[in-house]
Amino acid sequence: MNFNKVFIFVALILAVFAGQSQAGWLKKIGKKIERVGQHTRDATIQVIGVAQQAANVAATARG
């Protein structure tokens, strides 16, 4: 009976420490994904600006 209590206690302690180390790993991946999303957003905004300028040039050239 005591062995079961000790085993459960040790398992809980290991789960707590493993959960904390996992959070750091997941946080790093989350930040990388967020950074990729920000770069994609910025590139899209730049492409839209260039496309609008090209459309303005084409409209001006047509007269």
From Swiss-Prot:
Transmembrane spans: none
Pfam families: Cecropin (PF00272)
InterPro entries in the cross-refs: Cecropin, Cecropin_insect
Presence of keyword Iron-sulfur: no
Record GO biological process: antibacterial humoral response; defense response to Gram-negative bacterium; defense response to Gram-positive bacterium; innate immune response
One cellular-component annotation, GO: extracellular space
Cellular compartment(s): Secreted
Record keywords: Amidation, Antibiotic, Antimicrobial, Immunity, Innate immunity, Secreted, Signal
PROSITE patterns (alphabetical): CECROPIN
Signal peptide extent: 1-23
Modified residues (Arginine amide): R62
Protein role: Sarcotoxins, which are potent bactericidal proteins, are produced in response to injury. They are cytotoxic to both Gram-positive and Gram-negative bacteria.
Family of the protein in this entry: Belongs to the cecropin family.
Protein name: Sarcotoxin-1B
Organism: Sarcophaga peregrina
